[in-house]
Amino acid sequence: MVHSILLYTFLALSVFLSPVFAEARSPGCGKLPNLSNGVHKINGREYTLKVPSNYDKNKAYHLVFGLHWRGGNMGAVVKGEGVQPWYGLEKRAHGSAIFVAPNGKSAGWANTGGQDIAFLDAIIKEVESNYCVDQSSRFATGFSWGGGMSYALACSRAKQFKAVSVLSGGLISGCSGGNDPIAYLAIHGIKDNVLPFNGGISLANRFVKNNRCHQSEIHTPKSGSRSSVRTDFRGCSKPVSFIAYDGGHDAAPLGVGSSLAPDATWKFFMAA
């Protein structure tokens, strides 16, 4: 009798809990995709999709957005123009992630009326309807205006994205909402004369507050040192880190060959 009760309880709990776990897996899991690698159009705009060569329809993958800078385009992110291809993240993913590089409107991310957020929402729906994605493991990164767009995602889609990495960003794509916690990494040059360093601190401070971190001074490297200093905030509900480096408004902090931003971003994403 006791055995029967325990078995019934176990089965009841299994039925109750299974949808919770299933929610993390996208509708594309277990299906053969109708979407291939390459350029796709949606709602009159384009994005580039890169799926691992060993893709398994039954395995859930990370989903990573790489957002280009002002005057750039998705091809610059894919090929690596002034940056490592895919901001250096595809190499570090080792086949564990699906990558998306969208094209901004008029070579930027003004996000007027939330149109760029809506564009990324549509991409997510299309990609996840075709491929197996862990919906609790979406990420975004970008430089300059791409950083501003990553920040806008952190503001309005904190519940849909796990973490963002903002490279020399500014408040240039808006911040609708902006009250929810999300894992937030900022990387900013102390000599940035386009989107000033202090502005990057202000962006990060929103998530220091949202994530209920203990306040801390942002540490900086010495000018001319060609080095970086990292500040990890403590007591956060979700991690917040700020990397200050000796440089300006650079798509690739400390140079294209430097592993600083790619390593820090990928490790931060995986630890978030």
Swiss-Prot record:
What EC numbers are recorded for this enzyme?
Answer: 3.1.1.73
Kindly give the SUPFAM superfamilies that the UniProt entry links to this protein: alpha/beta-Hydrolases
The broad enzyme category this protein falls into is: hydrolase
Tell me which positions the record assigns to the signal sequence. Answer: 1-22
Q: Name one GO biological process term.
A: xylan catabolic process
Q: Which GO terms describe its molecular function?
A: feruloyl esterase activity
Q: Tell me where it mainly resides.
A: secreted
State if Secreted is listed as a keyword. yes
Gene3D superfamilies registered for this protein in UniProt: alpha/beta hydrolase (3.40.50.1820)
Q: Which reaction does it catalyse?
A: feruloyl-polysaccharide + H2O = ferulate + polysaccharide
What is the annotated localization of this protein? Secreted
Cited InterPro entries: AB_hydrolase_fold, FaeB/C/D, PLipase/COase/thioEstase
What is the stated purpose of this protein? Involved in degradation of plant cell walls. Hydrolyzes the feruloyl-arabinose ester bond in arabinoxylans, and the feruloyl-galactose ester bond in pectin. Active against paranitrophenyl-acetate, methyl ferulate and wheat arabinoxylan.
Task: Name the protein family.
Answer: Belongs to the faeC family.
Provide the protein name.
Probable feruloyl esterase C
